[in-house]
């Protein structure tokens, strides 16, 4: 499975360690279909806007996905949905 990350989960950012063991497939920019909401230290990606978001796509295990769910407060604070990427469908929070 795959995950698309942006913000604090990117390589070099404060929460990137949560992706330990994941394989970076590459950098990618979404189509301009989102809104990126600034909540201070944590950006939120929301559907229905006109913004393209640049991030990274990783191949992850089910265990890493479960860890990311804990970090993101899913279910609860964040939603998790599938988006299409050049490497196939990927989860995004």
Positions of PLM-derived features:
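Glycine-aromatic micro-motifs
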Residues: 1-93
